[in-house]
Amino acid sequence: MSQTHPFKPIFDENSKILILGSFPSAPSRKLGFYYANPQNRFWRVLAQILNAPPPTSTDEKIKFLLARGIAIYDAAICCEIKGSSDAKMTAVVPANLEPIFSGARIVQVYANGGKAHEICEKYLKTQILNATGKEPVKLPSTSPANANFGFERLVREWTIVADILRDG
C-alpha cells in the first residue's frame, strides 16, 4: 500500500547535521513521530554519544535535537511498504531536502542504515553534494531489525556524529 510521509522535518537555522532515515516505521506512523518504536535504538544512541539523558516525549525529542544542532527527516517522502521492513520498500519517491538546506547550515548528512543510504545515493546525492560539498555518510541502522549491531557497537559507529557536532 502506498504511504506518504506523515511528519515534517525537524530542523532550525542552527542545525549543522542532517540524519536521514529511510521512511517511518509502522509504530512511528501510528504514534506520530520519528523513531517511536521503543525497540529502535536511535534516541538511546544519540543520548549516549552526546552524554545526555534520553528524551522521552515528542517535545523533549524536538528540543533535544534542536539544542544540539541536529536535523532529522527521511530520505523517502512516499513509497509502497508493508509494515516497517525497508526490504519491502518499493516505488520510492525521494524527499525534497531543499527547504532544510536553505533554512539551516547543514555541513554533513548521515544516513541511518543501508536503505536510507541507498535512497541518498540513487536520488539525493547531487542535492546533498551541492548543499554540503560532502557525500552522505552511511551509519549502521538503529532499527531493531539490525540485530548484527549491539548497542555498544552502534554507539562506537555513531560517535562520528558527536565529533562533527563538537568540532564543526
Question: PLM features: what roles do these ranges have?
Answer:
Residues 1-16, 37-38, 83-98, 121-168:
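C-terminal capping/extension of enzyme domains
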Residues 16-22:
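Short, hydrophobic/glycine-enriched beta-strand segments
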Residues 46, 119-120:
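Hydrophobic packing residues within well-ordered alpha-helices of enzyme cores
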Residues 67-118:
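Internal catalytic-core helix/loop-beta-alpha segment
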